[in-house]
Amino acid sequence: LADIKIDNMHGVLGIHQLSDLSATLFTTFVVVVIINGFNLIDGVDGLAAGLGALSSFLFGLLTLFMGQFDIAIISFSLMGSLLAFLKYNFHPARIFMGDSGSLVVGMILSILAINSVKHGLVFEIISFPNKGPLLAIGFLAIPLFDSLRVFLVRIRNGKNPLYPGREHIHHALLDLGLGHKRTSGALYLLSFLL
């Protein structure tokens, strides 16, 4: 309907044009991974909202540079709503995002990521021209890589990767003695640097 799918990886990992079936399957996989990444990272007060706000800000800047002002409005609107929510979500949190919130944030960010892959910034003079795929991965690095790492650790240990556990990076930082605010702040900084 809206042609929201990744049909070309623009040379990243040597992948270019995808067939219609491959594009549909890969896009579905990407959407599920991003949605679950944000759901799984929502284990510390303020973390999912802050990372979502940062990601939506970066996607907003990207879409401004791409001249997609309507998508930029969506990105900055998500950022604004998450920043307003964040005021009440820091420890001790008065409201919680929950699954409903983290799944919606993940869904919106997955659409923004697909848009950046499909129409990303084009630099003709550098290796592969469209940097959209790499930018999307960079903007969502913490939830994506944390989920991947947790799934691999759980599988290696013979555990079901879909069951809850304390293998996430935010749990490791809490176990080191960082509180909720410092854990969230450290991961915000890491996400910004990536």
What function would you assign to each model-found segment?
Residues 48-194:
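Alpha-helical transmembrane segments
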Residues 36-39, 89:
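Asparagine-centered polar/low-complexity signal
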Residues 14-28, 67-80:
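Structural signature of hydrophobic alpha-helical transmembrane segments
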Residues 17, 29, 36, 161-169:
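Juxtamembrane loop-helix boundary motifs flanking transmembrane segments in multi-pass membrane proteins
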Residues 8-18, 178-179:
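Membrane interface segments of multi-pass transport proteins and intramembrane proteases
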Residues 2-13, 117-120:
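Transmembrane alpha-helix boundary signature
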Residues 2-5, 26-36, 52-58, 79:
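Membrane-embedded alpha-helical core segments of multi-pass
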